[in-house]
């Protein structure tokens, strides 16, 4: 299901609306924040999102939230696993911050993976895990 949010900090006046998607499959709950641009989630959005196993969150700034704001949103959602997205990659000409800035801000040691295969029984139970998917 989808949850309405904004692509900017001006209630959509600059970049319009964004949809947060909640995907439930095989007892795993994934939250994809899309081009989320708000500084933080509203109480209503947090309630609609609910418990999250895997959070896919933009971290590059400019068109979405930046590293510091992403850490704030992560603290609101408290997922078991984090997958950053929308950050600077080699050859990309858009002005985005690299994932290293987010990793430093978050303070977790990332696990680099080519492909993520996950089952409910393999989700972390104690500490949040940071996954960097390789391109």
Each language-model region and where it sits:
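Core dinuclear metal-dependent hydrolase active-site scaffold
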Residues: 1-50, 62-65, 112-135
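Proline-aspartate-enriched helix->loop->beta-strand connector
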Residues: 51-57, 61, 67-87
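Binuclear metal-ion centers of metallo-dependent hydrolases, dominated by the metallo-beta-lactamase
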Residues: 81-135
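A generic short-segment signal for beta-strand/edge and adjacent turn/coil regions
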Residues: 23-27, 52-53, 97-104
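Short histidine/acidic/glycine/proline-rich micro-motifs that form metal-
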Residues: 9, 61-62, 87-92
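Short, charged, surface-exposed secondary-structure boundary motifs
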Residues: 65-68, 92-94
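A general structural detector for well-ordered alpha-helical segments in enzyme core domains, enriched
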Residues: 19, 45-48, 69-73, 98, ...
């Amino acid at each position: 299901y989808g949850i309405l949010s904004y692509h900017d900090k001006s209630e959509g006046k600059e970049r319009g609306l964004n949809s947060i998607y909640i995907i439930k499959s095989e007892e795993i709950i994934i939250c994809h924040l899309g081009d989320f641009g708000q500084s933080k989630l509203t109480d209503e959005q947090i309630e609609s999102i609910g418990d999250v196993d895997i959070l896919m969150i933009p971290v590059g700034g400019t068109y979405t939230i930046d590293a510091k704001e992403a850490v704030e949103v992560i603290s609101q959602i408290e997922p078991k696993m984090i997958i950053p997205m929308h950050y600077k990659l080699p050859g990309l000409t858009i002005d985005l911050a690299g994932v290293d800035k987010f990793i430093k801000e978050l303070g977790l040691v990332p696990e680099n993976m080519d492909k993520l295969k996950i089952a409910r029984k393999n989700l972390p139970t104690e500490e949040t895990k940071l996954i960097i998917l390789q391109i």
